[in-house]
Amino acid sequence: SRGKPSQEQLDLSMGMMDVLSSYSDLACEDGTDCRNYGVLDGIQEAKVLIGDMIECNPENIIIYGNSSLNIMYDTISRSMTHGVMGNTPWCKLDKVKFLCPVPGYDRHFAITEYFGIEMINVPMLPTGPDMDMVEDLVSKDEAIKGIWCVPKYSNPQGITYSDETVRRFARLKPAAKDFRIYWDNAYCVHHLYDMDQD
């Protein structure tokens, strides 16, 4: 598969393999034994660590596995079968549409294709998706249920959404009550250059 780190890159993290041993304290502050299944929303210490990294309150964080693509798939699958926040399950609707910034991440598009969701191309600009088009489409069509977003270093162009683009996403007024922004911020801390993190 593509995008896998090289052996040299993997070797950079070898020191982490020696941090824990059979003598390590593997209990959380709340008493949870980290060797066991844990809790549904994730280990509190991990939530605090990630919260500090992304400037988010740990109470608003859920820790999943290491694949954002799995999270996206599971979220779409659940929306199809159970709906979003009490709304009609998408599988019971005549039409479900999704906005797809292009060029974009083909594996996001594969998820929508798998579930038979109609994809609407939205051109990428140097600042992110064409927000004039996004605002117009979502405000007029309640069949549009979401948009795929990779806001930092978006594949394949490496575009990072501008602050204004992010603000416009926050101000969207979608016709669909169950419209969601699928914000796959997988590269939020993976900067290539110390001095250029946009």
Write out the residue ranges for each language-model feature.
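Glycine-rich phosphate-binding segment of PLP-dependent enzymes
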Residues: R2-Y37
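Walker B catalytic acidic pair
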Residues: D184-N185
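Pocket-edge structural micro-motifs
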Residues: S1-R2, G65
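Conserved core of the PLP fold type I
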Residues: Y23-L26, D30-K177, C188-Q197
